[in-house]
Amino acid sequence: VVMEVSSQGLMLHRVSGFVFDYGIFTNLSPDHIGPNEHASFEEYQECKSLLFRQCKEGIVNADDEHVDGIIKNHTCKLHTFSCKKDADLMAGAVGYLDEEGQIGMHFTTTGCMNVYAVVHIPGSFSVYNSLVTMLTCHLAGISDEAILRGLDKVKVRGRVELVPVSKDFTVIIDYAHNEVSTRSVLTTLKEYHPKRLICVYGGGGNRSKLRRYDM
């Protein structure tokens, strides 16, 4: 079972009866803060950190500025991934894949896996997502060959999802619903040097109105 465990779920003890084999941390930004969520960023971070007190092994992004707060008081064995510093799994030689009808990333890894990898989802965040997936699968005993085959085929609906409409332009759908994720997607797409970039977005979901102003 692969389960997304929210900060609110941890705060409200919805998963207190579980001991997870692996707990994963990718990144943290000021989000989920408001009257119906967390009172402050500090509370949000503390609730996120609870995951690493109820899992056997933790897998964390060594490049995230909040990682020390997340692993504070951890009780699990830790594994790290990074694009910038020494870690159990590191990415290097990162490049942009831009072929007819598809865009993505390619990179090499060192550490517990020494491979060349391709993922057909654009952006540096896709490299980080690939690293954490590769590291988790490696720790679970899955072969490098199977990991690379899966990575080459993976697509996520609503995450920088290419929609075939016309040869004259490219349409991409993304779930970005706050300032940080919207900025990340637009920055990513700019790296492919389009002639023009048009963004149409909404602010639904009954979330904090502050999100709309930030976006």
Predicted regions and their residues:
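Flexible active-site lid/hinge loop adjacent to a nucleotide/diphosphate
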Residues: 1-73, 182-183, 207
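Extended acidic/charged loop-beta regions that coordinate divalent cations
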Residues: 3-33, 71-116, 156-163
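Fold-independent oxyanion-binding glycine-rich loops
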Residues: 3-6, 27-28, 61-63, 81-84, ...
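Residue-level signal for inorganic ion chemistry
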Residues: 4, 26, 44, 59, ...
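Residues at the starts of beta-strands that form the adenosine-phosphate
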Residues: 21, 57, 77, 143, ...
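P-loop/Walker A phosphate-binding loop and immediately adjacent motor/lid segment at beta-alpha junctions
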Residues: 47, 54, 73-81, 189-192
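Nucleotide phosphate-binding/pyrophosphate-handling subdomain across enzymes
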Residues: 107, 111-215
